[in-house]
Swiss-Prot record:
Names of required cofactors: Zn(2+)
HAMAP family documented for this protein: NrdR
Cofactor details (free text): Binds 1 zinc ion.
PROSITE patterns in the cross-refs: ATP_CONE (PS51161)
Keyword Ribosomal protein attributed: no
Cross-referenced PANTHER family: TRANSCRIPTIONAL REPRESSOR NRDR
Entry's Gene Ontology molecular function annotations: ATP binding; DNA binding; zinc ion binding
Species the sequence originates in: Nitrobacter hamburgensis (strain DSM 10229 / NCIMB 13809 / X14)
Protein name per UniProt: Transcriptional repressor NrdR
Residues of the ATP-cone domain: 49-139
Family statement: Belongs to the NrdR family.
Record field: compositional bias (Polar residues): 1-11
Role according to the record: Negatively regulates transcription of bacterial ribonucleotide reductase nrd genes and operons by binding to NrdR-boxes.
InterPro entries in the record: ATP-cone_dom, NrdR-like_N, RNR_NrdR-like
Amino acid sequence: MRCPSCNSLDTQVKDSRPTEDSAVIRRRRVCMACNFRFTTFERVQLRELTVIKRNGRRVPFDRDKLVRSLQISLRKRPVEPERVETMVSAIVRELESGGEAEISSEIIGEIVMEHLRSLDDVAYVRFASVYRNFREAKDFEAVLGELSSEDDARPVPLRK
């Protein structure tokens, strides 16, 4: 592993441990040339995924881009970063285990919306507004109508 401070390849792992959900291994490293300490994360990648964009272009799947788009949707929302990371891992696992090496951006968007809907309604609407390219207020009203009709269908817990 190359040192991010001096670019030396002479680094050593000082500590290695799994994260809470055991999906990622956290490694604490030290550069032998400059003594700079840094952390890396290692996760299993089942297969190389390619995203087919709406214009037909093919690009490698970028987990970090998914994280950034979710963080934008969840900005100033009361959702713990651990829950976001768990959701991202679940989405990536679902994509990788789908059997296809190439996945359309539409499918990825639908899967993300499914996960966001169960996590945070406001983030869901924010993501949907970009993903579905909302142009008018009635587009927001339609999504809000979907959410409220789902809420009406949910059983109300009994109070004791």
